[in-house]
Structures are given as structure tokens and as C-alpha cells.
Amino acid sequence: MTSPFRIARAWLGLSLLAASASLPAAAAGPESEQAAGRLRLGWASADITPDRSVVIAGGSAARISQGVSNQIYATALAIEATRDNGPSDMVIMVSLDLVGVTGILYSRVQERVSKAAPEIDTDKIILNATHTHTAPDQGTAPDLVKMHAQHGIDVPVAWAKWGIDLGVMPAEEYIDFAAERIAAAVGQAWKARKPGGISFGLSYATTGRNRLTAYYNGTSDMYGAANRPDFSHVEGYEDHSLGLLYTWDAEKKLTGLVINIAMPSQVAYGSRISADFWHETRNELRRRLGEEIFILPQVAAAGDQSPKVIVDERAEQRMEKLTGRSQMQQIGIRISDAATSILPFMNASIDFRPVFKHRVDQVELNRRVITEKDLTTRRSTFHNRQVESVQETFDRLLAEYKKMYKQFEEHPELKTKPGWFVSVTATHWLLARAWRTLERYELQKTVSTLPVKVHVIRIGEMAIATNPFELYLDYGIQIKARSKAVQTFVVELASPGGGGYLPTQRSVEGGAYGAIPQSTLIGPEGGRVLVNRTLELIESLWDEEK
């Protein structure tokens, strides 16, 4: 019996031939001739799955990994544009199945690449995270060493983030483990460069949803119940578009694709390492297009988005039973349908000599001001349902944490009980959030801005723009709508990507988790500055032609 996947691939092949015959290939206009360059493209990937137990990132208490559901990867795409009249330019984009990209991971990748391949401009490397909540933690938290010292707590530096030695691979060790492999993937992608072309397109898949529910009293809550009598509406917009960048070799054979989607990979949660729905998506796309295809995921602005279905939750669960597909499998199929549905037209629109420009800039953003009212107002939060001020939270949790820490010191046998670490790490996590908020109140008196790195890239008539935040969707929509480019990919949690949430004014007023002072370094004012400066940088890639 003929495999349905072989039939699908054969149909795609015929469609590609038909579309190639009927549609013109893209070409650079006369005004872009000087900036156009012959492309050389290279792909590589590396397995960054830890070889022993780690703390899993994401959430408000430590989780210790209990095995591997599926591997996590670094996927690298190297693009170099060589020009007849002028210098070449480049970018190496690397997607990581991690919750974020810490500054220390980014710098260690740069150091290793610089040493192994000095011809690579390491400032042109972009690392972005898929924001899976089932991957190793990278948090080293040197600032919390100060908190511990101030209060006479002797916590090993390697375990400052969680407040106690958890007896597994420390974050610092995993960072070195991952950096070595990520740097190797960067080098391999660079060495694999060959002449090729790109095409870009827009498709749609219903996947991510706004995760904030708003109520008639003006408040909103993350994952709040929608079946309450006072439920008013979902707080914000949802973006079901997919930005798709296809890469081709000189013979017009597909080599890989970049998928830009406004949804973090947060279906899975538990104690097993997983790439989340990107594992299912890779499998599905490779079944359709070939095992050799590379897939590079990017999260668009999605700080207030999630795969979780709130309004139609019961209907969605019923459909999973009827179809026999898990939510991750269903997402993988939807993304794959969207990516393959426009493939014939992408094959007919390959650009081998697009305009290519890459700028890296440091943008100064005003820090979110922590007011005295922020510190003294008594309120509950998503992770702390007690009604108390930030200072009261800190004082209470410090006493609780010190008591627990002392118990483990005096009775180490307590660490043999299953889940012994949950309560102490949850307490310490909330304690650290309160302490950092108090520290920021003092810091802002002398340091009012936060510098962030932004990449903007032009490839033909498309643009890519990065930021280090969990950027609320509205800002991404503003950038896409106002951009000079025909199509713009906004990439959050990138290079490095540890800026915290960047919420809208609407969300700040609602008071949900991602918009409170404890969760945010930058507020809505900084969000508008980021949008405007990003747009200026994108426009400069076109204005230089004038």
C-alpha cells in the first residue's frame, strides 16, 4: 500500500513544478542592485538535552527532571550575502528549545565561536528561545548572593536562585554544556554555507490565545476562570498568522524553514525534558517534506499568549478525544498545514540575490518606576494569594524560608522524601521577587534606564526585528503594522532574552501576573519607545537606498 505521506510529497512536487511555470521569480529592483548580494546559506543543529538531572525552568517552584520525553535542540541558520560592489553581511540565527537566553549563555557562546571561527562576527549571532517550560534552568542569580549574605544565610553560589542545594546539575554547569554545543552548531552552519535563495510568506494557524481573562470590576487574571458571572472579556488580541521564511539550495530544493509564531511552547509541564509542541511540529513537517529539513522556530511578540484554551476548553478536550490527537500533535498539524499550503508559491518566488542588511543597536529604555504605593499597597497576586504589601511579603517569607533552610541543615534526611524541595524553593522564589522589587526601588534613584540589544535584518522586502522581552502582543502588532517591510517577523526572548515581561497599559491597569511590578523591568512607556526605535531601525535599512 502506498504511504499517504509519499502521495502528499508527490503531489507537492507536481504543485511546485506547476507553480514554477506560472509565477515569476522575485528579483531586486534597480534601486536595490548595490545592496543585493548572492546568498550563501548553511544549516546545522545540536542536541542540547542534558545528560543528567537538572532543574527544569519555568514556574514558581523547582522541578527536578525525571527523564526525557523528547530531545531539545539548538537549530542554526547561517546567512551570508556577498556583494560585487561592497562588503558582505551576515546573520546566524539560532533557535533554542529553552525558556530564555541568559546573558551568560549568550556571552559564552560568543566566546567559543570567536575562538573557533574568528571570521564570524559574533555580534551578528542571534539566539532566541522557544520558551518551553520543560527545559533546563539557566538561572545563576548572582544578585541573590547579596540577599543571602545580608541575612546570614550560607547558600552555595551555584544554588542562589533556588535558595538550597538541589543535588543535580547546577545551572552554571548546564550553561557550559549547552554553550559548547550551540557554538558547535553555529560553526557547522557557517562552514555548511552554499549558494542558495530564500522566499517568505504569510499563512495562518489557530494555535496561541490570549491567556488573560478580564472581569467587570476592571481586574484581569492569568488563566482566570471564564465561567464566572463577572467574566467580561479576554483582555487582549490574538495573532494567528505565521511568518514563514523558506530556504532553498541552488537547484531550488527546500533545505529548511523559519517559523515565526505568536505563541510560546507551553503545552507541556511536569518533570520530563521536552521541546513541547515543536517536537511534534518537526516530526510532522519532516514526514511531509523529508527528514533532512531543518526547522527553526521563533516566538513572535507573545508575552500575554499561551496555547491554553480558556473559553472553549471543554470543547477542545472533547475534540482531542474524538481525533485521538494530543494538543501538541494538533498544534503540529496546524502549523504544518499552514507551512505546506503555500509551499508551491514559495518555490516560485525564490530570491537568490535579495537586498540583505543587518544592524545591531543598543536601545536605552526607561525602567518601570516602582512607586512607594507599589510597595505599600496590600494586594494578592497570582502566585501569592495573601493580601499583603511587598515589604510584608518579604518579611514573612524571609522568616519562613530561614526556618525551612535551618530544618534541612539540621535534618538532612528530610531531603530523601519525594518532592522535599517544592515548598522551600517556592517560598524562596516569591521571597526573591519581593527582594528584587525592593532593590529596584532603591536602584532607580541612581539608574533610570536599561540598555537592551536589538537586531534588525532586511532580507529582500521582509524584515526581522528582535527584542529580549516577553513582549505583549500589542507591541508586536504595532511593529508589524507600521513597518516599512512588506512582512516583518518580530522575535522575542532574543540575544540575550532575559528582559522579563513588557506589558501594555491596559494590562497594567488590570493587574495580572505579567503586568505587576514584580514581573516587569520595563513598563508601557518603555514599550512605546522600543516600538518606535525598532521601526526607525527597520526604516533605516530602506532609507539607505535613497
Model-found features: residue ranges?
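Non-catalytic substrate/cofactor recognition surfaces at enzyme active-site rims
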Residues: 28-546
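Bacterial N-terminal signal peptides
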Residues: 11-22
